[in-house]
Amino acid sequence: MTFQSLILGPALPEILLAVLGLVLLMVGVFRKTDSTGLVGLLAVYGLLMALAVVGLGAAPETPQLAFGGLFIDDGFARYAKALTLLGAVLTLLLSMVWLKRENEGRFEFPILVLFATIGMMMMISANDLIALYMGLELQSLALYVIAAYQRDNLKSTEAGLKYFVLGALASGLLLYGMSLVYGFAGTTRFDGLAQVAAAEGGISTGLLIGIVFIIAGLAFKVSAVPFHMWAPDVYEGAPTPVTAFFAVAPKIAALTLFARVMMGPFAAYADQWQQVIILISILSMLLGGFAAIVQTNIKRLMAYSSIGHVGYALIGIAAGTTEGVRGVLVYLAIYLFMNVGTFTVILAMRQKGRAVEGINDLAGLSKQHPMMAAAMAVFMFSMAGVPPLAGFFGKFYVFMAAVNSGLFALAVIGVLSSVVAAFYYLRIIKLMYFDEATEPLDALSGTTMKVILIGTAAVVALFFLAPSVVVDGAQAAAEALTFASAR
């Protein structure tokens, strides 16, 4: 490995965050007074600085490599990192409100979020199976800890333990798949794997089995069926801001990694893996739709809703085209704002100063807090795919990608599962506007939560006025991915 191959410029945002994380650890340890607020504020500034580096700099015309080719910087990575960093900033701001309100402040929390975000960014820019695994595990180790952040809360401890045990199993599947791929292809580099595929013209059974194991490991990380079993319990048991973080940033990073792996090194084998992705997508959409209907806890409902949304996003990957990748990226951008806004409302659900999570606790919300009810209605209508809200456009682009790729049955199943899912979204709206409250919710307090709620609701409601802001960026990012894959 030459000095030239160790150029670090493409990894500048990750390096900045890593240095900041180490500095904040020392600040937290050596500062005598409680440093949670200071460390949290500096972590937010650091994430915003990384977002500025990612978003303001022009994406390279050709992919830039670092660390001997293990790390890649291209337009696709820039777009996905911008979404991941934005999700991390918004959920960390919500977390700081919760930490102060619940008197749960410990300086390690924002640092763990910081390191989890670094892992996600490494995943997005992975250009090698080993780099992919390192990023994935850095993210996972931090997430295991924050899932069990409330050490004295039985549900939180259970959530962390379940996520850890099942996550270790998924990591084992992923590693086994990587070992098979390396054994049969002779390389772990993405460009090397693509060259092997082009040279052989076919696929060996061992390599195919390895790809299936890799898909299984990645499916766990995005909570796709049948590897979803951890999501409902972890979403319900983890602290609400942690659940919000789980539902947004790691999901975006893992789905974009999924797209890079399938459309990069394994693009030539699309005929083989496409059927697996289609099956996972259908199962996720159907389970996410039907299982959520019977839920009474809103965080558990959001877990199944998230599983359904993963199914819709996987439609774009199953399409196996630039248009499909664009659909996934548009969907994830919209999903980010819908979910952050919804979890802001969930975090605000309190009765006499006590947090509540029952869906029925939203009854009569429109009479008590009309602004909060209106914002929640916007998010629910959008998740149901009602035009002209943003959620409609997200589903439209992935369904169109499926149709243009000849996957008519998959698109039809997606539309039908959207109709099923609309039932539980509209049920929440019915509760807020047509039912009477047994006990009123406390008023929404705090400027941070109000700004996030109004901002996310405005983006979701007014997206149709300027969809090109997101769609054009997604198109350029998708073209960058397919260009890199074709090299």
UniProtKB/Swiss-Prot annotation:
It catalyses: a quinone + NADH + 5 H(+)(in) = a quinol + NAD(+) + 4 H(+)(out). One of its GO terms (biological process) is ATP synthesis coupled electron transport. Keywords: Cell inner membrane, Cell membrane, Membrane, NAD, Quinone, Translocase, Transmembrane, Transmembrane helix, Transport, Ubiquinone. It is a multi-pass membrane protein. GO terms for molecular function: NADH dehydrogenase (ubiquinone) activity; NADH:ubiquinone reductase (non-electrogenic) activity; quinone binding. Its main location: membrane. Pfam families: Proton_antipo_M. The chain crosses the membrane at residues 7-27, 38-58, 79-99, 111-131, 164-184, 207-227, 238-258, 276-296, 301-321, 328-348, 373-393, 406-426, 451-471. Its EC number is 7.1.1.-. GO terms for cellular component: plasma membrane. It is found in: Cell inner membrane. Belongs to the complex I subunit 2 family. NDH-1 is composed of 14 different subunits. Subunits NuoA, H, J, K, L, M, N constitute the membrane sector of the complex. NDH-1 shuttles electrons from NADH, via FMN and iron-sulfur (Fe-S) centers, to quinones in the respiratory chain. The immediate electron acceptor for the enzyme in this species is believed to be ubiquinone. Couples the redox reaction to proton translocation (for every two electrons transferred, four hydrogen ions are translocated across the cytoplasmic membrane), and thus conserves the redox energy in a proton gradient. This is NADH-quinone oxidoreductase subunit N. It comes from Rhodospirillum rubrum (strain ATCC 11170 / ATH 1.1.1 / DSM 467 / LMG 4362 / NCIMB 8255 / S1). The lineage of its organism: Bacteria, Pseudomonadati, Pseudomonadota, Alphaproteobacteria, Rhodospirillales.
